[in-house]
Amino acid sequence: AASDVYKRQELFNSSRPREYDGSHIQFTGMTPEITLMPHQKNAVAHILYGNNTLLAHCVGAGKTFQMIAAGMESRRLGLSQKNLYVVPNHLTEQWGSDFLRLYPGANVLVATKKDFEPANRKKFCSRIATGDYDAIIIGHSQFEKIPISQERQERLLREQIDEIAVGIEEMERENGERFTIKRMEATRKSLEARLEKLKADEKKDDVVTFEELGVDRLFIDESHYYKNLFLFTKMRNVGGIAQTEAM
């Protein structure tokens, strides 16, 4: 009997990834001169209903239009109020042009090099925070100049320190490699130093943080540029596991 139950589970119990169908989406405001392909509509549905989404399509599959359409539908449906698109620096103007080609009536704010110069950065970030835009488009390096709040930085650092401390205890209990433990201890000390420096720094009231922008949906073009950032793990010398240390 137990064998029959096992066979039944093998035959009939299974998990299947959810499939997203975007054929019903009307795309209000999109130019009638452009019609999205079925796979593009399905990708938009995935973004709208699937939360975090990776568009791992090949070059030329239309990922730009997918993200643009997803952002506009998200605003129309009330799923987001302020969409931020972070793209390679040399493509900000091209993205702005593509956005208006697909949605001619869209209100789009495109950052220029001057907007993120020290003298202009606060003013531009204030425009993002107070403006009612369908989309804000900025470059990767510009995005990296917008700090997250000190409170969030401290919380993230404390979480990483706690995770590493637990990992060290487990490695010592399991008689793990001393070299690995030393690296973990060095990483913890580095994070603790960052935390102390952060706590010692006076908060700059004239700096607009990411939280203050009001962005509630984020699109990253060419997101592979952000691969292999620091991630705590006890695994070492394993293909695909980032080896970078905490900055």
Spans of model-derived segments:
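SF2 helicase/translocase NTPase motor core
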Residues: H24-I34, K63-T64, R75-F219, Y225-L229, ...
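Short, small-residue-biased leader/transition segments that mark boundaries at the very start
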Residues: A2-Y6
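Structured helix-beta-strand junction loops
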Residues: L11, Y49-G50, G131-D132
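Walker A/P-loop
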Residues: G50-G71, K82
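Non-transmembrane alpha-helical segments in soluble domains
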Residues: Q9, V44-L48, G96, L100
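Well-ordered alpha-helical segments embedded in enzymatic catalytic cores
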Residues: H39-H46, Q66-A70, K123
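Proline-centered turn/helix-capping motifs that create local helix->coil transitions or kinks
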Residues: F12-Y20, H224, N228-L231
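Conserved pre-motif I regulatory segment
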Residues: S15-A56
